[in-house]
């Protein structure tokens, strides 16, 4: 066919031979193609030769309407009662692995409740819960290798929880005490851990997307047998950085998984006001990215999709987009009151009828791997573990104020050194006006 003959590297050269004739001939009059040659090189009008798209000509004016394209289906493995729908899609995870999924999700939920209340009591300055989205974090984390690099947004604490990040460090970061690896210089919930390959979170939306693509490109060039996973919400997908990241990943063929948590709201803006197309997964094919939409409240669906995307991203050096449909049960943050823009009944429906933790618990009960006594014991144990870490973090001092100026340059510039010295003189003179006894010396 013409598509096979007119390859990008040969098309122009062959077209020139058709127009100019054989070497040594003068003009078109000396060139007489045979019947075989006429069949081999059909008219250029048969198929478009434009370099920017692969398509066919039509002779009828018609715009493509988005509402006539059927929506991308939502892949799921188990129903709301924890029953496997199609046995061939069952990941057949061993009991201990499923219990680890469940314990990670419920421990995260317990930590959320305690830290949310601590902010309301004025003990920490800010917090963001993960209620209702635990399945997206933990299910995807379980499908990754521990060395895969993670770029999060600000609602992926479950990835760190699954990777056994200590509760003490979660608490230290939220309190900004001397045990915080970030030395108290980040907002709460902006975690980072080099040892667990989790890049420190940045508040501005979507900045992590092109950064993650760059990291994936570097991994590809190094033949590292590693992928990068980049998490973001559907609201962040409206940022320009998302477009840049998607396009770079596709054209540079980077081994990356774009993991979009579509939880229904970008702070107070519902999805109906964010976009008119079919969600986020529908954007992938336009960039040349393999895409899938999954039930984010089904931890096994999330696991399967991430596992396969990871396998193919490494084997084929190409990006994948996963849109996990879920619901943000909690407020956007402790600075938000979601009752101003959504009903209590709406929230209660998702909390009571389709919660990822409830669904996985039902699966465990169906398998005979869990019972009510174990549930009560684990709830008590997990709360005790969180409270112990909480109380320990609360007793610790804040980092020394002089650390405000460190860790920016390898060698501190003179200007920063002068500022550091100025702060030290100020505190020495007016120290009685500051709670310096709460800070490390």
Curated annotation (Swiss-Prot):
Together with BCKDHB forms the heterotetrameric E1 subunit of the mitochondrial branched-chain alpha-ketoacid dehydrogenase (BCKD) complex. The BCKD complex catalyzes the multi-step oxidative decarboxylation of alpha-ketoacids derived from the branched-chain amino-acids valine, leucine and isoleucine producing CO2 and acyl-CoA which is subsequently utilized to produce energy. The E1 subunit catalyzes the first step with the decarboxylation of the alpha-ketoacid forming an enzyme-product intermediate. This is 2-oxoisovalerate dehydrogenase subunit alpha, mitochondrial. It is found in: Mitochondrion matrix. The modification N6-acetyllysine is found at residue 352. Heterotetramer of 2 alpha/BCKDHA and 2 beta chains/BCKDHB that forms the branched-chain alpha-keto acid decarboxylase (E1) component of the BCKD complex. The branched-chain alpha-ketoacid dehydrogenase is a large complex composed of three major building blocks E1, E2 and E3. It is organized around E2, a 24-meric cubic core composed of DBT, to which are associated 6 to 12 copies of E1, and approximately 6 copies of the dehydrogenase E3, a DLD dimer. Interacts with PPM1K. Its EC number is 1.2.4.4. Its cofactor is thiamine diphosphate; Mg(2+). Keywords: Acetylation, Magnesium, Metal-binding, Mitochondrion, Oxidoreductase, Phosphoprotein, Potassium, Thiamine pyrophosphate, Transit peptide. CDD domains: TPP_E1_PDC_ADC_BCADC. GO terms for cellular component: branched-chain alpha-ketoacid dehydrogenase complex; mitochondrial matrix. Mg(2+) binds at residues 234, 263, 265. InterPro entries: Alpha-ketoacid_DH_E1_comp, DH_E1, THDP-binding.
